[in-house]
């Protein structure tokens, strides 16, 4: 009943109005799985390749017809008759057929969409929710947890058209007892932040991930207005709500000069100087997690940053590790960072994603499941977070349906699992247990 009988790909639209790949996998017995590939804006140079057509007369060159040719042609042919429940084999067939290191022949967007659709079809054939199937694929059947959200309520960098250099300023509702309560707390802070920004004459338009995108006097002011919003919502900063940042520092790094240029506030830093700047912020605000605090190639700088902050807070590698076990192993071996951001499409298949999560956990690193800035209504990452008991999730702010879809799926899963999926809050964050 779990043999693949048909694979279909189509071009749909993501949250930025760009095309992306959606795939359907059909099994014997009428079971169907459907999934869509997300797309990043600030991307690591070592990510698996997202295949775009380059035809400027169509979607400004961002069409995905070439990727769809792979889905509807060689991938579909190769997977006919295969057992969808054997996810590792399905993924390996596509990887081998592509034959490149970075999936550049078919595109990671093509392979990933089919990989996730296959998992959904297999879950349907087994008569179980996707998170339960993922837990079985992960070798941890029945082991679940609800993730602590990192909610990106001020957007900057590549995610917004403003003067804020640091890409994401996030809140974590650590005082919540359940995921549903955490979502409520986040929503209340989000609405109070709108009031705080309006009172200061700031814009309340939102960026790619649903957070506000005002022009501010400095990056530190973003933390200050969030602190005001937390208080206005009736919560205590550092107890009920903690803070996290994604610097996406590769986006403001000058490789020739080896400098970090915060143009929005007219400040330039050396590598160690920028780490010291971040360390100073952690003394002024309850920041418990910093992601991509340096350029992806600045491994010496990351060694310094990890030595300075790695015993105190969570140091997350996103562009640094790109969900790639080879690169993550180098980081583990050299004591670089202490956490990895997990993005399906950086590596391009569910099997490889699960391998990265396992490697991180085995080494004592945390794994933070993440969306991309270009998303769809597909909420698979919610099931991934619960099914791997990863403990943390980044899926944007409290606006835009492409973000809220993931929170709503988490609420449904928590309702279904109850006490079987504990919400551990701050204990999930490295160095905060």
From Swiss-Prot:
(2R)-2-phosphoglycerate binds at residues 167, 343, 372-373, 394. Belongs to the enolase family. HAMAP family: Enolase. Mg(2+) binds at residues 246, 291, 318. Pathway: Carbohydrate degradation; glycolysis; pyruvate from D-glyceraldehyde 3-phosphate: step 4/5. It comes from Aeromonas hydrophila subsp. hydrophila (strain ATCC 7966 / DSM 30187 / BCRC 13018 / CCUG 14551 / JCM 1027 / KCTC 2358 / NCIMB 9240 / NCTC 8049). It is an enzyme of class 4 (lyase). This is Enolase.
